[in-house]
Design a protein with these regions (language model features):
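A charged, amphipathic alpha-helical module
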Residues: 1-31, 148, 152, 156-282, ...
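Gly/Ser/Thr-rich loops at beta-strand to alpha-helix junctions
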Residues: 33-42, 109-115, 248-255, 330-337
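TRNA-binding/sensing appendages of the translation machinery
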Residues: 20, 27-54
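Acidic/His-rich segments in extracytoplasmic proteins that coordinate ligands and/or metal ions
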Residues: 86-160
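Redox- and metal-dependent alpha/beta enzyme cores, enriched for Fe-S-associated oxidoreductases
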Residues: 43-72, 246-313, 317
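Conserved acidic residues
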Residues: 31, 102-103, 322
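C-terminal hydrophobic structural anchor segments
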Residues: 303-347
Length: 348
């Protein structure tokens, strides 16, 4: 095993794990499920299925410098220019035949409105089975039972499509892995608050993936363990004059101007992204579906914009950030809509 040196070494290995997962889904679409970033994937990992998600696909394609071809193809077919870039790229990949038909398409009503539109279009295009998990705006026991039953129903559909039953022991194992990963991420955040590290936008996206689509998979847990090891050896934050930046929303790792500012000019370092910390609640492996449901319901991206803003401010303070960047683009109406409120709250 290669010896760890800094956070970038952990990023590199996680990038490899994400790329292998995406390639596995492209090679074996009959064992892949297209999901949005908020969909619990522990039951997929337990069934040996690969989650394919627009954010990962689009970043992977952006590294090949051909994402514009797919975005333009989607626009020609009627997708608005102002639609989410991640989902627009994914739709263009599907309409050009590059993205094969998956076993199932599954999304949630949480936060991202683009996934409900693009996933329905994908399901009609292939055609492919579509499941949408309805996430209420409250988190009481009735809501937990309601969402848990939907997740069980999705699992039954997957069992019918694959001809294989879910192994409950494997699901509990995946849930235990997920619980450890979230606990480790909380531990890493406490360490990260006091040290300085060389960071990249792609690396922060890796952290987001580790606490979402690869949550419950060994790759996600191993990545966070590596982050902890590098943070323990990192210099104290007082040893640098770089500004510590906390990022709200996904990071545009393809944008040269942002790369220069946040990576190459050595003026700033990223200390975190709000989406990584949107739901770090403890999980009960003995109640897997209820735990997945509760994580969806307590996610700060559900409900009012104030929940997300309050959570971002709290984590920015915990991580000793000097400033916050809220990345707005046409595609994410929720993030763009909360920008003025967030600016006012951050400047108070």
């Amino acid at each position: 095993c290669q010896k760890l040196t800094d956070a970038k070494s952990a990023y590199a290995r996680m990038n490899g794990a994400v790329a292998r997962s995406l390639v596995r889904g492209l090679r074996h679409p009959e064992r892949a499920v297209c999901v949005n970033i908020f969909m619990p994937c522990e039951m997929l990992h337990a069934m040996g299925l690969t989650p394919m998600f627009p954010e990962g696909l689009s970043v992977y394609v952006a590294c090949t410098a051909c994402q514009h071809v797919f975005a333009e193809r989607a626009e020609v077919s009627g997708i608005p220019e102002s639609f989410c870039s991640y989902h627009k790229t994914m739709l263009g990949m599907a309409e050009t035949g590059v993205l094969p038909k998956p076993l199932m398409i599954a999304g949630t009503t949480l936060a991202c409105d683009a996934n409900q539109l693009s996933f329905r279009r994908l399901a009609a295009l292939y055609p492919a089975p579509l499941t949408i998990i309805d996430v209420p705006g409250r988190a009481d026991d009735d809501a937990v039972a309601y969402v848990a039953d939907q997740l069980r129903g999705m699992t039954r559909r997957l069992e019918a499509l694959t001809g294989r039953k879910l192994d409950e022991a494997k699901l509990r194992k995946s849930m235990a892995c997920a619980d450890r990963t979230l606990k480790l991420m909380r531990e890493y955040a406490a360490l990260r608050a006091e040290v300085t590290q060389d960071t990249t936008m792609t690396g922060e996206l890796c952290s987001l993936i580790a606490t979402h689509c690869l949550l419950g998979h060994a790759d996600g847990e191993n990545y966070v363990r590596e982050l902890i090891e590098t943070a323990r050896r990192a210099p104290r934050r007082e040893t640098t004059r770089r500004k510590r930046i906390f990022f709200i929303h996904t990071l545009p790792n393809w944008q040269d101007s942002m790369i220069r500012m946040l990576e190459t000019e050595n003026r700033c370092e990223l200390v975190g992204c709000d989406l990584t910390f949107d739901s770090l609640t403890a999980l009960d492996p003995e109640k897997p579906f209820e735990s997945m449901a509760r994580r969806l319901l307590t996610n700060v991206n559900g409900g009012s914009a104030a929940r997300r803003i309050d959570n971002a401010i709290a984590w920015a303070k915990k991580l000793n950030a000097d400033g916050v960047i809220l990345f707005c683009h046409w595609g994410c109406k929720q993030t763009m809509g909360l920008s003025t409120l967030a600016k006012r709250r951050l400047e108070e």
